[in-house]
Amino acid sequence: MSLSRCILGLACLWHGVIASPLGAVPSNIPIATDLQTAAETVAQPIANSARKLHGKFLHITDLHPDQFYKPHSSTDEADACHRGKGPAGVYGAEVSDCDSPFALINATFDWIAANVKDDIDFVIWTGDTARHDSDEGVPRNADQVLGTNRWIADKMAELFSDSTGRHLEIPIVPTLGNNDILPHNILLPGPNSWLQHYTHIWRRFVPEAQRHSFQFGGWFYVEVIPNRLAIFSLNTLYFFDRNAGTDGCASPSEPGYKQMEWLRIQLHIMRERGMKAILMGHVPPARTDSKKLWDENCWQKYSLWLRQYRDVVVSGVFGHMNIDHFFIHDERDINVGQLAGLADNSIDIREAMDDELSVTGAADYLRELRQNWAKLQPPPTDSKNSGQLKKGKKGRKGKKKKPDVWGERYSLSLVSPSIVPNYYPALRIVEYNISGLEDTPVWRDAAKDAMSIELEQNDRQKHLDLKRQHPSHMEDDDEIDAQKKKGKKHKGGDSKPKKPDFLIPHPPAKSSPPGPAYSPQPLTLTGYTQYFANLTHINNITTEASSALLDHDEEEETWVDWLLRWRKGRHGNRKPIHPKPDPREFQFEVEYSTFNDKLYKLRDLTVKNYVELAYRISKQPKKGKAKSIDVSYESAAEEEEEEEEEEEEDLFEEVEETDEEEEQEDDDLSDGEEVDDDSDEDELETETFKKHDKKKHKKKKGKKRQNKVWMHFLTHAFVSTVEKEDLKKFT
């Protein structure tokens, strides 16, 4: 048997028996064992289809429809927009903890039908299609959770079906959210009743050839452009640190482990077939120095897979967090020794991130991200670091390392804001490069094929035989090897740790060009347009001003209370003046577009550009005054200094200080520098506030410098719901 066939035989590995909640023994997951079979099991293209690729797709997430929502109800926590009198709008209570009224869902689908439907190639739908369990008076039940999911699935199918209503015109790729099950966050290993229900609800979306795989663990993929691009729907609930029903990705008996093995095998097959992949899921692999959303072992494997299959993976796309942002995976955070069992992984100082981020929690999280971004090393460009491009760095044994021109040390994950109006409802249209693909045969809604039935009858013993035949291969890449050795820590004696049964995927061939995540080419993400619905304008609510209440609040309220008050919505909980709702016409409008955003300056969505953006967001004003330059002598150092000065002008702006002197201990996330002509002291100033509207010590107004790209990023993170002056309080 050839080595390539042995490698492909890995498709049958690690799909052993998992006990279901009812004690039933599931069948093995059918996975293609050779390239021909894999190609035959996908939806076949229509040779003469009139439909062409547009180079766009829709990402929609966290709809949270709530059948109990009532307009003009109270936004208090005890009422949750279900009862009482208050400012809940017809289309939702913006900037609150209330869920989405059906009116918002219907209006969103109407807008998509009128403005988006005919211009996109596929839909990525990243879960949470049931309301939160936030009202003790109306607890959730399975019928409600499944009912709203079924309703939205039917609306999706109806919207994107052909004139007969029997076939989808474009593929829709859903995934499970942590609120799409009961109790929320907890999903036991499959097969189970939840996966069985969603197999039926999503029968139009999950390819028949992978139906059994989905029933087994809730993961699958769709070739949205046959033989060119696949969307992988990951069941991130098995990676989620708050899922008490499973235990991460370390043990072969865990569904998280099995899913990672499935993903590794499928990405290998994608590489062999010359295909690319977008990875999507609900819970993102968010991770800072103190917080995390995924189990650490799952995060480590996922990051390693991204690195080793960087020629295949285009990007990661996620939801859940409601805030618009991104994060960057650094290969130097990968601990292969830990994954291989050569290092202690029992100590992890990172705490599980809050299930639902408050404004304060989100601000803290974004500040930590910014701290991490300050450590990034942007890839060299023609105008900067030209010396690094030519010389390179000396690596192990004195060998010169090639400069990382494309930023392949890093990987990218994008997180979109939500439909549920925790801020403003939002959705995203992402564009990708279709150069040379304009006439490519497109996806079609395929009927059940005989091949899927045949795959389901694969013999379990054959899987085990293939597993035994495949030789363990450990990656010999210098950097991976160094990290492995770094993880080896055994004390005393001549005993050596047992060789682990851990397979590290092969990286791209050294002769391979950078993938679409790094170098502009077909299937590279070129940009996106972020849309939002300004519910403050659309709901058109005027509320009563209760001066007595406001005076009391302003006198007693701390800054923490002020931030938490946002969760009651834009209007607090004041009653509307007009008894009957009078909303304006519902519309989504452009919040920003990466194609023309003058501060983000993203030429496309390649990793290199995002690393540069993250680094610019992290920059702090320099202490001291700029040194004068002798124009009579131009050296490389002076040119570099001039470039730095231009960058300073580009990144920072002078703003008036507030009348109030804010007190806070020094930290690394200071965003302002005092500009005082009468003093030589130039210290970075940090901002906070001790009490929201209490009297404070007054000081003479001055000017400070702040990073306008960071402020711009924060504005979009909260979907333009927070005024600039208030954003300063978060920084």
UniProtKB/Swiss-Prot annotation:
InterPro entries: EndopolyPtase_N1, Metallo-depent_PP-like. The chain crosses the membrane at residues 5-25. GO terms for cellular component: fungal-type vacuole; vacuolar membrane. Its cofactor is a divalent metal cation. Residues 26-731 are vacuolar. One of its GO terms (molecular function) is exopolyphosphatase activity. Residues 457-474, 492-501 have a biased composition (Basic and acidic residues). Its EC number is 3.6.1.10. Residues 636-686 have a biased composition (Acidic residues). It is found in: Vacuole membrane. It catalyses: [phosphate](n+1) + n H2O = (n+1) phosphate + n H(+). Residues 390-402, 691-706 have a biased composition (Basic residues). Residues 505-519 have a biased composition (Pro residues). Residues 1-4 are cytoplasmic. Belongs to the endopolyphosphatase PPN1 family. This is Endopolyphosphatase. The gene is epp-1.
